[in-house]
Amino acid sequence: MPPKKNVVEEKPALIGRLGTNLKVGILGLPNVGKSTFFNVLTKSEAQAENFPFCTIDPNESRVAVQDDRFDWLVNHYKPASKVPAFLNVTDIAGLVKGASEGQGLGNAFLSHVSACDALFHLCRAFDDDDVTHVEGEVDPVRDLEIISNELFAKDLQFIDGPLDKVEKLFTRANDKTKKIEYDTLVRVKKCLEEKKPVRQELWNEKEIEILNKHLFLTAKPIVYLVNLSEKDYIRKKNKWLPKIKAWIDTNDAGAVLIPFSGAFELKLLDMPEDERQKYLKEQGVTSNLDKIVHTGYKALQLEYFFTSGEDEVKAWTIQVGTPAPKAAGRIHTDFEKGFIMAEVMKVADLIELGDEAKCKAGGKYRQQGKTYIVQDGDVIFFKFNAGAGLQAKKK
């Protein structure tokens, strides 16, 4: 049976800014370990004091995406320059109950959330008498509810403006071109009233275009991070983890949950490399920071391809689904304008076979045209019509 024509595929929405310079914000209540996490993640020294709102202006940094494939390419080509992919991370000040109504630092915090493209939602599952909890007792499920409710409340406040505007045009001015926009925003409001995140709804391409005009907070992808004590992280047990997982399954099905320990990571950060490796081996654990970075990168729908040679090995960030000419444009706009072809090797093939010559001999070095969709880990050699004094090839 032939496929139906003009059927718009429904898929999870990629809502928000399109591009490669996207960032993940670290979100949570005060004193749950956000600044400590940011410090160990970026190896920076952002202030981390034991009182609410010590992080007023968001600290921003970028974190290298650790990749064994990139390390292999660097070792193989021994380039003069090496540039990995990076994840942009922002430490947002602690959000408190009532922020949507101006409590704490209120709407200033929510504007920082709005400026991010995805979120690390960090909750605390450790007891420490020296680190007070803004709500008194430690209860990460309650904390998840507080943050979730504030995001829903802010979206509900926001939706009325654009919905009223398009409703006037559609129903009163009889502007039929506004029907899709009106129907989409009505559906968004229904989701919010039912406490269903916008990201959990299925949207078609046209609806996504409309949603991308707005910055709904509940549309942003979320990775849930649970900050454990060093002891619980090492023994891989904590009484709150099953309850947190149950909350996520009910309220944000399919979202990723990653346990980590700020205290554990901070301890590793202060150790020399040989001592660190010995300690990890003795405890039978590994750091989860690389996993967190990779998960945040994927949450932004980002991936990267490599250009490699003796001059430079570089990972170029693109959005998933990028065609070859647009990927070439990440290097220089002339590469996109004068695109001829992309000569592509899979990095896995290159690692397995050992060098480019063997990839070519084994039929693993392919010429791809304008319709080729670049895949994560492609090693690409672009050919283009030279312009603006550039060389005819870039690798």
From Swiss-Prot:
Matching Gene3D superfamilies: 3.10.20.30, P-loop containing nucleotide triphosphate hydrolases (3.40.50.300), TGS-like domain (1.10.150.300)
GO biological process, one term: behavioral response to starvation
Residue ranges annotated for the OBG-type G domain, each copy included: 22-280
Highest taxon in the source lineage: Eukaryota
UniProt KW Membrane keyword: no
Known tissue expression: Expressed in the nervous system, pharyngeal muscles and intestine (at protein level).
Domain TGS: 301-384
Pfam families tied to this protein: MMR_HSR1, YchF-GTPase_C
Binding site for ATP: N31, V32, G33, K34, S35, T36, L228
Record's subcellular location: Cytoplasm
Alphabetized GO MF terms: ATP binding; ATP hydrolysis activity; GTP binding; metal ion binding; ribosomal large subunit binding
InterPro entries assigned: ATPase_YchF/OLA1, Beta-grasp_dom_sf, G_OBG, GTP-bd, P-loop_NTPase, TGS, TGS-like, TGS-like_dom_sf
Chief location of this protein within or outside the cell: cytoplasm
One GO cellular component term noted in the UniProt record for this chain: cytoplasm
Cofactor or coenzyme needed: Mg(2+)
Magnesium found in the keyword field: yes
Keywords associated with the record: ATP-binding, Cytoplasm, Hydrolase, Magnesium, Metal-binding, Nucleotide-binding
Residues the record lists as binding Mg(2+): S35, T55
Oligomeric form and interacting partners: Monomer.
Family per similarity comment: Belongs to the TRAFAC class OBG-HflX-like GTPase superfamily. OBG GTPase family. YchF/OLA1 subfamily.
Function field: Hydrolyzes ATP, and can also hydrolyze GTP with lower efficiency. Has lower affinity for GTP. Plays a role in regulating starvation-induced thermotaxis responses in AFD thermosensory neurons.
Protein name according to UniProt: Obg-like ATPase 1
Organism of derivation: Caenorhabditis elegans
